[in-house]
Amino acid sequence: MLGDVLNTQELLTLATAIEGHPDNVAPALLGGLTSSVFEDGKVYSVKRNVDETLCFAAIVPDYKLLTEAARAALPKEVSHKDAVYNLSRAALVPAAFCEGRHDLLAIATEDKLHQPYRMPLMPGSKEVFDMARLCGAKAVYVSGAGSTVMAVAEKAEAEKFYSKLEKGLELLEGLDGCEAFTLLRLDADNTGATVE
């Protein structure tokens, strides 16, 4: 990454010390799908390449959701049942996104720990979820703390998916306090940060 200056581990640790969240730093630096933990001043991170037959739609509303407000919406405690629900689905994420198991995408992205609490702060988000599924999304989820919603589709159907989603989002404009949505067509970046 930075050649002789810093190795990848040193760069991850330094960037996490500055930014504070290895789950933000690792994917930006490494690309792909990452799992990361910051423990005793060190980042432990695993990277896998995202299946290149997938495409992504970032659906960005015209309002901002402050991270502080999104964090404050989360409960201080969660039930054991909800924790197990999320952990079991998180275990499916690598197979769904990296091993071509598209049949697992929807269930792997189901959530009971943050989306039910944050979506009420995101006007129109439930309708966006429903519209994306109606347009052919294999999975839909809140990106980070919100307010962006991500939808996942198969590249073989990308043009049809994006076209239908664009038209569908136009129908949702003005709904529930959201005047407009921006649709970003994305592919996974399995390379991460580079220096030229």
Task: Kindly give the residue locations of the regions a language model identified.
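Solvent-exposed alpha-helices and their adjacent loops that cap or buttress functional pockets
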Residues: 18-20, 26-29, 47-52, 85-86, ...
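A glycine/threonine-rich phosphate-anchoring loop and its flanking beta-alpha core
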Residues: 36-46, 50-69
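Short beta-strand scaffold segments in enzyme catalytic cores
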Residues: 25-28, 33-36, 57, 149-151, ...
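Short beta-strand segments
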Residues: 28-31, 37, 58-62, 142-144, ...
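Glycine-rich, charge-dense phosphate/pyrophosphate-binding loop(s)
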Residues: 97-196
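Gly/Ser-rich oxyanion-binding loop with an adjacent helix/lid
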Residues: 1-44
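Active-site rim beta-loop-alpha module in soluble metabolic enzymes
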Residues: 57-120
